[in-house]
C-alpha cells in the first residue's frame, strides 16, 4: 500500500456542479460533448467519464484512438469522437468499436472507406469533418471545403456524422481576439452551409470550446465541447469572476519535517533562498516529478492550517520547502494544500498557480504525475 502522503483528491460533487453550470450556459437543445482527453485533464478519465455518463452527457471527445479505446474498455457506451483523427492502420479498430473520428484529408477518407468495406460489420465509418477556420493546426482549410466535400462523395462507406472547427483565441476578450473569433465563426458557418448545399446532413455541428460557451452565441451549432470548465478552471484570466465553477482537483501532502534556521542559511539547490532572519522551514514530500512546477521556485504558495506559506528555495524532484515562520501552530503531520480548495476555506486555484509558474491552467492540471501521485475520489 502506498503510504506516501502526497495525493490528489478528485471531488465528483464539484464535477457535477460544473456540469450543471455548463448545461445552463448552452442554448436549449444543445448537447454536450465532454472533452476527457489527457486522462480527463489529469483527473482520471474512467471515474470522470462514468460520472458524466450518469449525468446524461451526450458524447465524449478524446485526442487519439488509444484514449477512445480506453473509454470503450471501461464500459462507456456514449458516442466517442477522436478530435485529432486516426493514424494509418487504426481504421478497423476505430470502426469496430463504433468510435467516430475527425477527418481532414482524402487519404484518410480512402483508408476508412476501404476498412469499412472490408470488415463487413454493416456499419459505415462515422466521420466529423474538421475545418481549419484559423487555428492553423488540423483541418481542411475553410476555402477548400467546397471542393473537399464534392470529392468526399465518392466514398460510399463513410457517414458525415458531424462538422466542426476550433477557435484559436476565444479565451482572449480583447478587441483583436473577439474580432478573430467572430471571423472564425463566420467561416465555420459558411462551411456548414456549404455542406448542406451539397446534400450532407451532419447530425452534429460544433465549434464552442469552454471559452466560447461562456462568450459566444452560436445558434447554428447543436453541440458544445466543454473541457477545462468541467474541471473547475477557467480558460484564461479574462474570465475571472464570470462563472461560479468549483475546482475538482486538490493536490495535498503533509509536513514531513520542521526546523529553525538562522539568518544567512541557504535552502535547496543553487542557494536561491537565503533566510533574511531566523525562519521556520517545513519540508514537504512533493516535487517536479509529481507535476509541481519547478518554476514555482521562490514563487509558489501552499496552505497549512488555513494560512499561506511561500515556497523557500528551488523546487526539487521530490521535495519542496516552505517558510512557515508565520503559520501559527504548525506541526509535523499537518496537511498541506498545494493546489485546489483547502478545508479551511482558501484555495490555490489552477489560475493562480499557472500565473506564478508562467504557464496556463491546462498545463497545471494535466501535469500532475498520477503515476506517482495516488488519486482519491470523493463525493
Swiss-Prot record:
User: Active site annotated at which positions?
Assistant: 37, 269
Please list the GO terms describing molecular function: alanine racemase activity; pyridoxal phosphate binding
EC assignment: 5.1.1.1
Tell me which GO cellular component terms the UniProt record holds.
Answer: cytosol
Question: What name is this protein filed under?
Answer: Alanine racemase
Biological process, per Gene Ontology: D-alanine biosynthetic process
Q: Which organism is it from?
A: Citrifermentans bemidjiense (strain ATCC BAA-1014 / DSM 16622 / JCM 12645 / Bem) (Geobacter bemidjiensis)
Modification type N6-(pyridoxal phosphate)lysine: residues: 37
